[in-house]
Amino acid sequence: MEIPVATYRIQFTPSFGFDQAKAIASYLAELGISDLYASPILTARKGSTHGYDTVNPNQINPELGGREKFLELVAELKNFHIGWVQDIVPNHMAFDSQNHMLVDVLENGFDSQYREFFDIDWHHHYPENKGKVLAPFLGKFCGDCLESGELKLQYEENGLTINYYSLKFPIRIESYSQVFTYDLGRIRDKLGRDHPHFMKLLSVLYMLKYIPSGEEGRERYDQIIIIKRMLWELWNDSPEIQEFIEYSIRAFNGEPGKPESFNHLENLLAEQFFRLAYWKVGNEELNYRRFFTVNDLISLKIEDEQVFHTTHACMLKLVQEGTISGLRIDHIDGLYDPAQYLTRLREHAPEVYLVVEKILEPHEELPINWSIQGTTGYDFLNQVNGIFCQQCVAPEFDTIYQRFLGRKVCCEELIDQNKRLIISRHLAGDIDNLAHLLKQISGRYRYASDFTMYGLKAALVEILALFPVYRTYISSAGTSKADREYIKQVMTQAKKNIPNFLNELNFIEKFLILDIDEHLSPEDQEQWLHFLMRLQQFTGPLMAKGVEDTVLYVYNRLISLNEVGSHPTHFGISLEDFHTFNQQRASQWPHAMNATSTHDTKRGEDMRARINVLSEIPQEWEIHLKEWREINAPYKETVNRQDVPTPNDEYFFYQSLIGAFPFKDDEYPGFVERIQEYIIKAIREAKVHTEWIKPDTAYENAFTNFADRVLKDPHNNPFLEAFRPFQRKIQHYGILNSLSQTLLKATAPGLPDFYQGSELWDLSLVDPDNRRPVDFEIRQKYLQDIKTKAAQDLSGLIAELLQTPEDGRVKLFLTYQLLQARRVYLDVFQRGTYVKLSVAGSLKSHVVTFARELADTRIIAIAPRFLTSLVKEGEYPLGEQVWHETRIVPPAGSSDVWYDAITGHKVQGEDTLWLREILQQFPVALLVNHVETSTTEDKNQEAE
């Protein structure tokens, strides 16, 4: 197995495809990247900017360049010894007419060869859904769409479809006779009964009466092909037949203003294997599993072996050919049986590097029995982010936040309220389906046959709302100790909350702990297990939508802590916890990813690094908040008897400005537009004053108008005059945090993952802002300049970079130096032990340090933090005037010569390493203890 040295995430889009990536191959290699980490590359919906909406799992996306350009890119990368880690999406595909497997299901229903591919309940409890797939994509009620003429019957080579703007739904072949026999006498009289074209049409109509069904699958498909081909020939060969078909379609499409004219189309729709509906119906009457709450992403039954092989054939072939060396599994928690899936995948790809997108709650551990290398790095992200938040000021920050809002805020209550909101408003249909499944089972169980739907659903809602993690992994293989503890915790609290439903809770608890009665039939036991497996698929979406996509936009105490996988009640983490996390990682998951920015993070890594600085100066932060609120009060509008923005949204706004404010003046106009777009997304996600399913445009416009007034005219603006000095101060200390964070990412157990463009400052907001095009030309230019100057005068280069940190070159330089060192001492970083080091002196809490050891090589990472109290704005934490007697005790057995892989500086110290001697030129250090004292560049040459 090839373990990456460092990965670089690329977001492929139609405007940045394989050719564009080929142009940066040499740059990635020079930077020190070992593997390109690609967003999904299989064929997605046309124009897709992310690739998670796959429509063909066995074709490389033509919009990215197709297979030919893909192989050219891979070959170019291999020339530079760069591998390929591929993001794959086993959970879902696009619900779209471009998805031919799904179209086949919509056209053929139970007779489709793909009927078991998608997670559809064909026997749904709502009669109108039985034997159909709900298609909740209409912008208003179905009847209104019908009578307004928005639903159009259309005929083309592939047959009849119902079109709703760009959406197309296939008409089942059995319904063709409705259309093609409409006023049949008209064409008979026109052509004559014996006309060959009319006779051919009659033969088609006779064939339509005897469409094979059931076991005669292949014959059915053959006959459909013949019928469609004959009809298309008639369309092309006979102007009279063409006019007849057009006439029939016009009749079916009706005339707005005449409701009765749509009866034919309504009857035709009633026969189909799909049920068109208003999009909001999807939240309540859904009969297929979605990705989270996204109606147009339909889930696969990937647990079915045939589905697995069909959807993975292309990727596994690329793995087996050696084209792809790593896989990243998207949304592992959505799968029916994640462990089974990973086992099956590993059987087909035994040597592939394998990581999963798994969101771990604080102190939650990854299942140790999964045959993978680890997670994609959100767990590391929250650990490294947390150590730059000063924990001791949590009570003070609570007070500041609540004083600004004028009310108390309890995050735990917000989590509970919003999970219940998501259950009632966005996942109601999913929970309803679970409750009906449970009711079916209880009806066949003598001790639960009297339980009502009301009681069972109330118990289910309580359990789901209380779930403390994204999901458990209980299966027929058993239950882990951790999962048993989670279940115990949930059930204990649920029984306290709703004691009137104790019997129902006890019944469900039997499922959750696999306490299945032996006297049950094998079929009943299988149903019990199925319910448990199904329930576990929905705790993740609830956590994601209730907390990650709601509470993290509502609880704004310190928004740098509101990140994927975080728990916003945790105000930073202790150094002790950080070291414990790293020690566990080194022993259990040494090859997991260390991420600091991804395509899904709420903020770019350097935006978070800035906002964390506020935790060091809470009193100053509150003074400025009051000042800004007073200055900006005249810019607020009143909507529904409240000033906009509300205090909570205004508090969020100022933090966002501090974090994302651009370094360069020429970026300012674009920044204002980005902030306004961000505001809309953030407040809709918060679901307090507006939301996606019911936008309040009055509130939204008032807030964006406020932002426009506050930020307009940067040269004559009272707010900016008050804001910019404080923002510049935060910016400076944020830079120092960022450099420390970069060092820790590259040296802690795991491998560093760099999100596209983040080798310079990453002040991105949430997607789609973080998927903006990356200027690789300037990065290539900067890197060449750094390499040239470093070879001539490394100390001079460092001084230059620290004088002009705004352009981001200092971060690029650090990244480059760290990745070169990582390549030279790869074994130490991949296999070395993790040693927590002791720091002595009055400033010991301001230093994060640890060692990596393997054989006779020791490497020490030194990253300062909490620097507002140590250096003035514009200064760097360098030399004796800052660090005084602060010192590190190196690992036992070290020699007395250390070499800084960042600056080339040599340090003496066998028993003690003084920070005043180490941090003389650069704010962070990477000390290498080796007999030789050659530079990293010399080491590289030796390695070659």
Regions found by a protein language model. Name each.
Residues S48-N56, H92-D121, N369-Y378, R771:
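Aromatic- and acidic-residue-enriched segments that line the glycan-binding/catalytic groove
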Residues I88-F95, V835:
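Short, glycine/charge-rich beta-strand/loop segments that flank catalytic centers
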Residues D96-E174:
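Active-site region of glycoside hydrolase catalytic domains
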Residues N91, R328-L335, Q803:
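Conserved short loop/turn motifs at secondary-structure junctions
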Residues F80-H81:
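Helix C-cap/helix->beta junction micro-motif
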Residues M1-K46, N58-Q59, E63, L71, ...:
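Carbohydrate-interacting/catalytic domains
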Residues A94-F95, L106, Q402-L405, A435-H436:
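Alpha-helical transmembrane segments and their helix-helix packing motifs
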